[in-house]
Swiss-Prot record:
The modification Phosphoserine is found at S137, S151, S172, S577. Induction: Up-regulated under hypertonic conditions. This is Nuclear factor of activated T-cells 5. The gene is Nfat5. The modification N6-acetyllysine is found at K139.
């Protein structure tokens, strides 16, 4: 536009014609400007002006306009104006400018421009001419407008009209013509441009806010038009100039300020005049020069503003006010010699020389809560901030309301002209001015500028992020690649010996400028000044640029000349830890790992080195060892890691290396020395060993193992921190690898420890209680040693001895550490480690009680647990699992049979011991002891439980942890790999990681996958418990999905993964169940008990899943993190049972979740709380004992898949975050709660009630079951209504879970009828569950749906409920396990849908499966949704093979319903097995489908054959085969599942 206008002007358009042009054009051009002037077409020019310019008071308008328009149309016209101004400035008379302006404008133009110029003049006169221009412009405009546009003058807005292009044109002319107003010519001269100021003002007003750009640009034609501009009165012309400029031009109308003063005042814009006090009288020209001190009065700056303030564009939003140089205060001004209130004016001036408004920056008002009230005024196109100075403040003011605004280029051009805009200036000053009225009415103006302020973003401070070389010969000349930030021109790279000493040697490195880049450099190392050093010298590298020096000084080492021979050796040896001279050494020394590592490193020095490096440097090195380890997958590597712990340990480890027990033995040996020397360090050192071992077992794990090593070497907090970093790195790798292996557990463990730190503190206390006396521990251990002697005599002996010593040491150290460690996170980890060690010791002891296999494994696991807890239970479990799987696999089958018997007896012994220990340990024991209980339940289970114990101990302290324990105490066992990892350390943090990695980890084999899922689910549960947030639970679901997928279907991975994991969870439960009764343990643990034996068994029967499970269980037992246990999901079940059985549940209730049936019964006998806790896994056969503990509620929960999820959730939610978990577990919680103890049990009881009848409860305590059933029925009835609500919206399930735990109870509690009603109500919810999606959302509700079935299962007596229960029961166990997520309600894990539901989802509802699988709604429920009867069949589909071999085996061990609960993991009965059928051999092995024989009689079948049943050649496998075929048939009959499906459907 400006150019157009200029062309028009040059075309000698009459003022009128331009005006017409202007009005029309401006209207067209500046529709936005027609805000207020929409009415004035004639004022089109005015309309063109921005709204602010026109209607708002000039200063405001001007300011606003300016700020907005500075770059806009106003900007363009102003350039023209600027030119005019420039000419006028040269003329050095405003009048001249004015006249030129007027002259150039024809009358028409003038009218518009007059309006503008008037406005401008007014503006110039009053600092806020723009606004005041309205008045002035009204008058002037009226005249002018009359000349040009009658209508334009009619409105003050005419003034604004004037600003349109014409005005700009006129303005520039006017500036020239301004000569009429000689007054301002000088000032105008001073201003960058006289008209520019006026233009600026107006323009800024209109331009900033509007799209007046075009009009302004039109105005630009002003220069051309100038010649033709008519001259107006000085005032008028000034005003016009000012107005025109300011109207369309940039805000800053420099020139026209003074000239227009009169106009300004006369313009109705009194506001402006008075505002600024810049009336012609008051308001001096902004570009005028005024003294700082006069007549005894002085305006001085007390505090100067900051030297750099990044100005902002109007569109950027505020960057805040200008601060002082401390960044804590604001520039402060004081007026001395005057005691009357005055107005302080602040504007942005140029950076040097005579003060005048800045051409590129404007002041802007900053508003805030506590800022000083101020107002913006537009003077001569420049925004001025006015603040009151008051005597009350001693005439001192901290100016906290002034920011700096950067004008758009268009505004700048409009303001100072195109020529002026080329001279970029990024520095400005704040100019402070006061106008003091003398007694005679005259005004004294004082003005003082601040120091210059740089208004651009400063160059970033350089940083070095990474360098390619850490050490070099003293000769230098090697190239170093530096990666970093902000390497700008002028960068220097300095090598300095002592950075803090400026006089120390320093040298500038030569930079390769050809490859110089902003974020990377290549420099040559300068030679060191002393070429004859004999020891490495550490210097610092930093980068210096104009912006300063890099904050972080990178260490660099000059090594002696290679001639000395030290350099090369050092570099090579220390490559992984080049920081040998650095503080890492201390950490290493503290670790005492160097010597040990070397010894143990026999096989893998790299691994040793990595642990040694445990500092940041080690990080890199660790990664390599991890890779190596994964490749080698050899126990020596882990041993190497273990070596880090202690020389003795190394020896023990080496001896252990010979056999699978070696891992546990190294752990034990490691524990004892480290415990004595440094308990804190010991757990950490321990961890590395465990990790290493795990890595050996799982290829993926090796990556994790170094981290574990590092964490195990936590002895020094520095080392620990460094290792933690390493861990995290490994964690990432771990997860990837773990997805196929138990490595996942490791990474999760890493996170878990942090989450569990507080729990760890508690745990530290608990461990002492748990292990009340070393004597008892040693007794247990000796017993274990004897038992272990059977399976792993050699390794067991060393491991258990170490364990006993460790237990004693750990107890002592833990007590000490508990006091010390509790205070610090490091301490927490140490406590956790110690706790784990204790737990592991207990579990070891328990293992001794349990069959030799378990004891041996436990010994190894136990040893690891200490390591694992601090470092990562995960890796330990993985190690154990792998070791067990590889070494023990062969032994496992042989030993398993032997050990099964031993396990049964030892399990009973362990359970007894556990009970006694639990009782003695009290809360701490109950928390910590659940692992002991698990140990009793089964070796594998004990490790899992141990970690749950940790969780539990932690959980009791924090409710979240409690929930985790409850839900997860079993899940950790189940998780095996992941659970153990996540249980203690990472339970809370990576629920998803848990689940996902377990999937991958277990994914190695079908069995392994099932385990993974299991571990994932349980890990998630553990995580949830630990984290106390439900996030992990959500992950849990996915993991379950994977489990289910692995077992049955890919689709079920989403929702089914939950179910799948549910199956695995069942396995976990079976672990609980196992513990529950020696039988169940024996069967579950037969694979589990002999770690090697169980492993072989698991591996063969279960395939990877169970095989892993066994090792996992063992690992879990030893690790106490269910990491490996989880992979051996079914073992995990035993472990879970153990966990629940341990006293931990009593205190924490949540830990009880995984008590074995026996333990549950004991717990029930011992404590209702334990029962409740146990109830989590009690749900099915194993669960039933748990349920007995937790009452019928738990069973009900487990019986039905929904109950399972409820149970899981309730376990978590009840104990820890029932409310939080409620959403997820609410139905479970509610169910569990009602029957269970009033507190957690209210929530948990109903869930468990349902579960309990499911399996274990029935066999374990018929009376309890009946009671539970009754409670359930009552609760169901009560809750049915609630539950109907709950179920009414499956999502509500989560809601309900969070909102009401009792309603969830209802959900679970309801027996068949209540369940049916609830389910009916829920049907949509559960049906949705069937549609995996709702299940994902609710997860819990899904479990709830099958609850009626669960209730039926609970009460063998009630046939109707039982049949539904049967179907439900199968699925329910899975669900239950899944839900064992920690208190994280958020993730309310309805993870454990009944397998039937899962199968239904898979087979019947592939699509729903996806939706539902995440939720894993009860199998029955899902089938019910699908076809009422289908649920069992779908379940079968999910767990096709599960029902046959594995589950039967698991259940068979328990023989009784209790055992079934042990099988609970895959409590899918027939359906479950069908689900597993996908790979009958593999899936059953993996999932060990807990199909209870596949018949509605879940209880009868509840003695699910060992999870490994298929792989294992037990009667269970036969049953599983039958079940499988039955399941297949059922799958075919999915829609018409009768025995289970009918009831389920009815319930549904």
């Amino acid at each position: 536009m400006p150019s157009d206008f200029i062309s028009l002007l040059s075309a000698d358009l009459d003022l009128e014609s331009p005006k017409s042009l202007y009005s029309r054009d401006s209207l067209k051009l500046h529709p936005s400007q027609n805000f207020h002037r929409a009415g004035l077409l004639e004022e089109s020019v005015y309309d063109l002006l921005p709204k602010e310019l026109q209607l708002p008071p000039p200063r405001e308008t001007s300011a606003a306009s300016m700020s907005q328009t500075s770059g806009g149309e106003a900007g363009s016209p102003p350039p023209a104006v600027v030119a005019a101004d420039a000419s006028s400035a040269p003329s050095s008379s405003m009048g001249g400018a004015c006249s030129s302006f007027t002259t150039s404008s024809s009358p028409t133009i003038y009218s518009t421009s007059v309006t503008d110029s008037k406005a401008m003049q007014v503006e110039s006169c009053s600092s806020a001419v723009g606004v005041s221009n309205r008045g002035v412009s009204e008058k002037q405009l009226t005249g002018n407008t009359v000349q040009q546009h009658p209508s334009t003058p009619k409105r003050h807005t005419v003034l604004y009209i004037s600003p349109p292009p014409e005005d700009l044109l006129d303005n520039s002319r006017m500036s020239c013509q301004d000569e009429g107003c000689g007054l301002e010519s000088e000032q105008s001269c001073s201003m960058w441009m006289e008209d520019s100021p006026s233009n600026f003002s107006n323009m800024s007003t209109s331009s900033y806010n509007d799209n007046t750009e075009v009009p302004r640009k039109s105005r630009k034609r002003n220069p051309k038009q100038r010649p033709g501009v008519k001259r107006r009165d000085c005032e008028e012309s000034n005003m016009d100039i000012f107005d025109a400029d300011s109207a369309k031009a940039p805000h800053y109308v420099l020139s026209q300020l003074t000239t227009d003063n009169k106009g300004n005042s006369k313009a109705g814009n009194g506001t402006l005049d008075s505002q600024k006090g810049t009336g012609v009288k008051k308001s001096p020209m902004l570009c005028g020069q005024y003294p700082v001190k006069s007549e005894g009065k002085e305006l001085k700056i007390v505090v100067q503003p900051e030297t750099q303030h990044r100005a902002r564009y109007l569109t950027e939003g505020s960057r805040g006010s200008v601060k002082d140089r401390t960044q804590q205060g604001f520039p402060t001004v004081k007026l001395e010699g005057h005691n009357e209130p005055v107005v302080l004016q602040v504007f942005v001036g140029n950076d040097s020389g005579r003060v005048k408004p800045h051409g590129f920056y404007q002041a802007c008002r900053v508003t805030g809560r506590n800022t000083t009230p101020c107002k913006e005024v537009d003077i001569e196109g420049t925004t001025v901030i006015e603040v009151g100075l008051d005597p009350s403040s001693n005439m001192t003011l901290a100016v906290d309301c002034v920011g700096i605004l950067k004008l758009r280029n268009a505004d700048v051009e409009a303001r100072i002209g195109i020529a002026g805009s080329k001279k970029k200036s990024t520095r400005a000053r704040l100019v402070f001015r006061v106008n003091i009225t003398r007694k005679d009415g005259s005004t004294l103006t004082l003005q003082t500028p601040s120091s210059p302020i740089l208004c651009t973003q400063p160059a970033g401070v350089p940083e070095i992020l990474k360098k390619s070389l850490h050490s070099c010969s003293v000769k230098g000349e090697e190239e170093v690649f530096l990666i970093g930030k902000n390497f700008l021109k002028g960068t220097k790279v300095i090598f300095q010996e002592n950075v803090s000493d400026e006089n120390s040697w320093k040298s500038e490195a030569e930079i390769d400028m050809e490859l110089f880049h902003q974020n990377h450099l290549i420099v040559k190392v300068p030679p060191y000044h002393d070429q004859h050093i004999t020891l490495p010298v550490s210097v610092g590298i930093y980068v210096v640029t104009n912006a300063g020096r890099s904050h972080d000084v990178q260490p660099f080492t000059y090594t002696p000349d290679p001639a000395a021979g030290a350099l090369s050796v050092n570099v090579k040896k220390e490559i992984s830890s080049p920081a040998r001279p650095c503080s890492f050494e201390e950490a290493l020394k503290a670790m005492k790992t160097t010597g040990c590592n070397v010894d143990k490193v026999t096989i893998l020095p790299n691994a040793l080195i990595t642990p040694l490096i445990s500092s940041s440097m080690i990080k890199t090195e660790d990664v390599t060892p991890m890779e190596v380890t994964s490749e080698k997958r050899s126990s020596p590597i882990f041993q190497t890691t273990k070596t880090v712990g202690s020389t003795q340990q190394t020896l023990e480890t080496i001896s252990n290396i010979a056999g699978n027990a070696s891992f546990s033995s190294p752990s034990s040996s490691h524990l004892s020395p480290e415990n004595e020397n440094q308990q804190q360090l010991q757990p950490k050192a321990y961890n590395p060993e465990t990790l290493t071992t795990i890595q050996t077992q799982d290829i993926s794990q090796p990556g994790t193992f170094p981290a574990v090593s590092a964490s195990s070497q936590l002895p020094s907090s520095d080392a620990l921190l460094q290792q933690a970093a390493q861990f995290q790195t490994r964690d990432a790798q771990s997860r990837d690898t773990m997805q196929s292996d138990s490595v996942v557990n490791l990474s999760q463990l890493t996170e878990a420890p942090q989450q569990q730190q507080s729990p760890l503190q508690e745990q530290a206390q608990i461990p002492s209680n748990i292990f009340p006396s070393p004597n008892s521990v040693s007794q247990l251990q000796s017993t274990i040693q004897q038992l272990q002697a059977g399976s792993f005599t050699g390794s067991t002996a060393s491991g258990s001895n170490g364990s006993v010593d460790l237990v004693q040491q750990v107890l002592e150290a833990q007590q000490q550490l508990s006091s010390v460690l509790f205070s610090t996170p490091d301490g927490n980890e140490n406590v956790q480690e110690q706790l784990n060690a204790d737990i592991f010791q207990v579990s070891q002891i328990q293992n001794s009680v349990s069959p030799g296999m378990f004891s041996s494994t436990e010994s190894a696991v136990h040893t690891r647990p200490d390591n694992l807890l601090p470092g990562r239970a995960d890796s330990v479990h993985q190690q154990t699992e792998n070791t067990l799987s590889s070494q023990q696999q062969q032994q496992q089958q042989q030993q398993q049979q032997q050990q099964q018997q031993v396990i049964e007896s030892s399990a009973a012994m362990v359970m007894e011991m556990q009970q006694s220990i639990c009782q003695a340990a009290a809360q701490i024991q109950s928390e910590l002891f659940p692992s002991a209980a698990s140990a009793n339940g089964s070796l594998q289970q004990s490790p899992v439980y141990q970690q749950p114990s940790h969780m539990m101990s932690a959980l009791p302290t924090s409710e979240d942890m409690q929930m985790q324990c409850e839900l997860f105490s079993s899940p950790p066992a189940v998780s095996g790999n992941e659970t153990s990892t996540t249980t203690t350390p990472q339970v809370a943090t990576p629920g998803s990681t848990m689940f996902q990695p377990p999937n991958s980890g277990d994914g190695e084999e079908t069995g392994a996958q099932a385990k993974q899922i299991q571990s994932s689910v349980f890990q998630t549960m553990v995580q949830m418990q630990h984290s106390g947030d439900s996030q992990p639970q959500v992950n849990l679901f996915s993991s379950t999905k994977n489990i289910m997928s692995v077992q049955s279907n890919g689709t079920q991975q989403q929702g089914n993964s939950l179910f799948q994991q549910g199956s695995e969870m069942l396995s976990l439960q079976s672990g609980s169940f196992l513990q529950q009764s020696s039988h169940s343990q024996a069967q579950l643990f037969h694979p589990q008990n002999p770690i090697a034996d169980a492993q072989s068994l698991s591996q063969e029967t279960q395939g990877p899943m169970f095989h892993s499970a066994n090792p996992i269980v063992h690992s879990q037992t030893s690790t106490a993190s269910s990491e490996q246990l989880q992979p051996s999901m079914f073992h995990s079940q035993s472990t879970i049972a153990v966990l629940q059985g341990s006293s931990v549940p009593q205190d924490q209730q949540s830990p009880n979740i995984y008590l074995s049936q026996s333990s549950i019964s004991n717990l029930q006998t011992n404590t209702v709380a334990q029962e409740e806790q146990i109830s989590f896994f009690s749900a099915q056969n194993s669960i039933s004992p748990l349920q007995s503990t937790s009452n019928t509620e738990q069973q009900a929960a487990f019986q039905q898949q929904p109950p399972i999820s409820h149970i899981q959730t309730p376990l978590l939610s009840q104990e820890q975050a029932q409310p939080s978990q409620q959403g997820l577990f609410q139905p479970q919680v509610a169910l569990g709660s009602l029957p269970a103890n009033p507190m957690p049990q209210n929530q948990q009881g109903p869930i468990f009630q349902t579960q309990r009848p499911i399996v274990g409860m029935q066999s374990n305590s018929p009376s309890q079951e009946q009671q539970q059933q009754q409670q359930q029925q009552q609760q169901q009835q009560q809750q049915q209504q609630q539950q109907s609500i709950l179920f009414s919206n499956q999502n509500a399930m989560a809601t309900m879970a969070s909102q009401k735990q009792p309603p969830p109870n209802m959900i679970f509690s309801p027996n068949q009828n209540p369940m049916a009603s609830q389910e009916q109500q829920n049907q949509s919810i559960f049906h949705q569950q069937s549609n995996m999606a709702p299940m994902n959302q609710e997860q819990q509700p899904m479990q709830f749906q099958n609850q009626p079935t669960v209730s039926s299962l609970q009460n063998p007596g009630p046939t109707p409920s039982e049949s539904p229960q049967t179907s439900l029961f199968h699925s329910s166990p899975q669900i239950q396990l899944v839900q064992g997520s920690p208190s994280s309600q958020e993730q309310q894990v309805t993870l454990f849908l009944s397998p039937a539901s899962m199968s239904a989802l898979q087979t019947s509802i592939n699509q729903p499966d996806m939706q539902q699988s995440p939720l894993y709604s009860p199998q029955n429920n899902i089938p019910g949704i699908q076809g009422s009867t289908s649920s069992p069949q779908p379940q079968a589909a999910l767990f096709h093979n599960t029902t046959g071999g594995t589950i039967n085996q698991l259940q068979n061990s328990p023989g009784s319903s209790q055992q079934t609960s042990g099988m609970f993991l895959f409590g899918i009965q027939n359906n479950c097995s069908q689900l597993l059928t996908s790979g009958p051999a593999t899936l059953p092995e993996q999932l060990m489908a807990i199909n209870q024989p596949g018949q509605p009689q879940n209880e009868g079948q509840s003695s699910v054959t060992t999870l490994l049943s298929q792989q294992m050649p037990e009667s269970a496998p036969l049953a599983s085969s039958v079940n499988n075929s039955q399941n297949m048939e059922k799958i075919d009959l999915l829609v018409s599942l009768q025995s289970q499906g009918n009831n389920l459907t009815g319930s549904f």
